[in-house]
């Protein structure tokens, strides 16, 4: 996945026509399209193949099963031309390593989620999950744009591995804060696909991200 705009569009929709239209409209401002269960359960894995003809696709399946099942899931992801897959870290090193070993692209481990409930159960083990992601050879981690101070800490743990940061827009995160904190990519969904002009909104967000990336780092 080549970094141009730092924007990943979360296609959290169920209609194939809407997903393909959004992808075509925003592709000039998006580095990858993230698909989740709502779209795939509605349209099947064929939608991943179709989106992959427009741009890079990350399957946000938050894979969370035993090692053998994880291998089977990850194999299917890459058979359908995705470039990456998101997996949960709490399942343990052996199960995450199975995903990495089966992958023919990038594996991103969820270190900490962006919703409020994650602060209760997820955050206390998040640092350990980030360390594990490095140890098993994952391409990077997922860390919350809603808590940029956590992104800053995760950067010290994962070094030059990628950080994907969801929660920009509807959840309250800004495009600039996670980038300044060290995120490589921001993940945005509703703020773009619910906008009157998704292409214009995507352009605006990438401009904000670019300004943040160019600014001197905060200490």
Walk through the language-model features, giving the residues of each.
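Conserved N-terminal beta1-alpha1 strand-loop-helix module at the mouth
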Residues: 1-59, 65-71, 79-82, 126, ...
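Conserved anion-binding
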Residues: 2-7, 65-148, 160
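Conserved, mostly hydrophobic/aromatic
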Residues: 9, 33, 60, 85, ...
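Alpha-helix-loop-beta-strand connector modules within alpha/beta enzyme cores
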Residues: 41, 45-61, 101-112, 152-168, ...
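C-terminal helical cap(s) of enzyme catalytic domains, especially alpha/beta-barrels
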Residues: 99, 176-219
């Amino acid at each position: 996945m080549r970094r141009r705009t730092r924007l990943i569009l979360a296609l959290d929709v169920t209609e194939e026509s809407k997903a393909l239209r959004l992808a075509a409209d925003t592709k000039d401002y998006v580095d990858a399209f993230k698909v989740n269960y709502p779209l795939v359960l509605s349209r099947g894995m064929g939608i991943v193949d179709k989106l992959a003809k427009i741009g890079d696709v990350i399957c946000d399946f938050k894979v969370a099963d035993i090692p053998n099942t994880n291998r089977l899931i990850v194999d299917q992801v890459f058979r359908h031309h995705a470039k990456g897959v998101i997996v949960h870290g709490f399942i343990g090193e052996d199960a995450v390593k199975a995903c990495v070993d089966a992958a023919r692209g990038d594996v991103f481990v969820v270190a900490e989620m962006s919703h409020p409930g994650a602060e209760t159960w997820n955050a206390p083990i998040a640092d350990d999950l980030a360390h594990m992601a490095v140890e098993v050879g994952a391409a990077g981690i997922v860390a919350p744009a809603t808590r940029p101070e956590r992104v800053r800490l995760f950067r010290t743990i994962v070094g030059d591995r990628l950080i994907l940061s969801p929660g920009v827009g509807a959840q309250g995160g800004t495009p600039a804060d996670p980038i300044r904190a060290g995120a490589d990519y921001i993940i945005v969904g509703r703020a773009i696909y619910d906008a009157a002009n998704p292409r214009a909104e995507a352009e605006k967000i990438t401009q904000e991200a670019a300004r943040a990336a160019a600014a001197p780092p905060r200490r």
